[in-house]
């Protein structure tokens, strides 16, 4: 039929880059309770990777986002060329600036950015409780992982991006 486009699900080869020596670890306070009865009660966060090509050269972009479990909207997101602490800190600071009175349960995986002492201090100063997925249990951050999957299936997989600008525009 005209205008109908099929998408296929690609297998994931992603992984969380764990901190070799985490400075701070939190319990899984969220415990897969993905229902929130009000905005800003529970938030999830993660970073995902995208690739684009200039000639034969592969380049990467990283998208950090924070999702509100109440309505599954993205509260804050930042795109950068490096997956580093600055990416996550900027995403977090942007969310706090937009909703300074929010004090949600804040859940992430155990990636190196989230186990950083500086990040934990930022959460404490914002009046948020930190929660982390258990080791090797990406389902503990299921709605966030699901968001990435939908975004990539509908907008990214099956396409070849040939410039940074084209990829950023898609995101």
What are these regions (language model features)?
Residues 1-171:
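Charged DNA-binding/catalytic regions of mobile-element recombinases
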């Amino acid at each position: 039929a005209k205008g109908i486009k099929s998408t296929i699900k690609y297998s994931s080869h992603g992984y969380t880059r764990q901190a070799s020596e985490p400075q701070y670890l939190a319990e899984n306070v969220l415990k897969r309770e993905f229902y929130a009865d009000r905005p800003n009660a529970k938030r999830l966060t993660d970073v995902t990777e995208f690739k684009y090509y200039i000639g034969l050269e592969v380049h990467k972009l990283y998208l950090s986002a924070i999702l509100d479990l109440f309505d599954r909207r993205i509260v804050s997101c930042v795109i950068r060329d490096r997956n580093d602490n600055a990416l996550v800190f900027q995403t977090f600071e942007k969310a706090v600036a937009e909703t300074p009175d929010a004090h949600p349960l804040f859940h992430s995986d155990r990636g190196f950015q989230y186990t950083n002492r500086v990040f934990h201090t930022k959460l404490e100063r914002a009046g948020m409780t930190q929660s982390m997925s258990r080791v090797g249990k990406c389902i503990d951050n299921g709605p966030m992982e699901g968001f990435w999957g939908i975004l990539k299936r509908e907008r990214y997989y099956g396409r070849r991006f040939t410039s940074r600008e084209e990829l950023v525009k898609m995101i």
